[in-house]
């Protein structure tokens, strides 16, 4: 049994509140246990300079944390005048993951910005951001589709992310909270599509190694968790949008 009473293969309680903000084309509040992230999607009718005139779209992401999202206050990055390496890495990860399931040609010459703002952190902020940002992005694209239907719906598949790890006394586990993540011998983030394809695997031994058997166990746990997350996404988005993603 884990510190919060979960079994090794159990996600934390997932709660998604759609249309959490009134202004963005798509938005959700996603809660993964005590980790809470607001994800919003904004549509711009322009693309980055390097893509102008190509007729293709772009997906980009920004990530930030409230100063007191953690147990001690952090200085706002805007006050420092620069984005930290960690933030830059996570922003690129979110954007890269979302672009993997979007047909940028079908999107047309527009940019969708995903803003992921962590209001409370208890481990897994980047994976929660990806899972929530996907829902917000699809909501925004669905609104465009309602205005002028796409010949081909730009979203090709579902996408979700979770964490897995190896604990000294608990073995392989799914969806680590902060206490578990801090003590983990191995920490891995897994991003997958609804069809079971991998988008990214980020795994690291923390002063430890892991075996091929443990790797297989971690991947199996991740696949189980992501499958459950995608079912939640489908429930939030509804049958009509789910059918559009499936090409029906």
UniProtKB/Swiss-Prot annotation:
The Enzyme Commission number assigned here is 2.7.7.56
Q: Which protein family is named in the record?
A: Belongs to the RNase PH family.
Q: Please give the organism.
A: Listeria welshimeri serovar 6b (strain ATCC 35897 / DSM 20650 / CCUG 15529 / CIP 8149 / NCTC 11857 / SLCC 5334 / V8)
Q: Which reaction does it catalyse?
A: tRNA(n+1) + phosphate = tRNA(n) + a ribonucleoside 5'-diphosphate
GO molecular function terms here? 3'-5'-RNA exonuclease activity; tRNA binding; tRNA nucleotidyltransferase activity
Q: Which residues cross the membrane?
A: none
Role, per record: Phosphorolytic 3'-5' exoribonuclease that plays an important role in tRNA 3'-end maturation. Removes nucleotide residues following the 3'-CCA terminus of tRNAs; can also add nucleotides to the ends of RNA molecules by using nucleoside diphosphates as substrates, but this may not be physiologically important. Probably plays a role in initiation of 16S rRNA degradation (leading to ribosome degradation) during starvation.
UniProt cross-references to Pfam families, sorted A to Z: RNase_PH, RNase_PH_C
GO terms (BP aspect): rRNA catabolic process; rRNA processing; tRNA processing
Provide the coiled-coil residue spans: none
Which InterPro entries does the annotation name?
ExoRNase_PH_dom1, ExoRNase_PH_dom2, ExoRNase_PH_dom2_sf, PNPase/RNase_PH_dom_sf, Ribosomal_Su5_D2-typ_SF, RNase_PH, RNase_PH_bac-type, RNase_PH_CS
Q: Which UniProt keywords apply?
A: Nucleotidyltransferase, RNA-binding, rRNA processing, Transferase, tRNA processing, tRNA-binding
> How does it associate, per the subunit comment?
Homohexameric ring arranged as a trimer of dimers.
Q: Quote the record's binding site residues for phosphate.
A: 86, 124-126
Origin: domain of life? Bacteria
Name of the protein this chain belongs to: Ribonuclease PH
Q: What class of enzyme is it?
A: transferase
- Recorded name of the encoding gene: rph
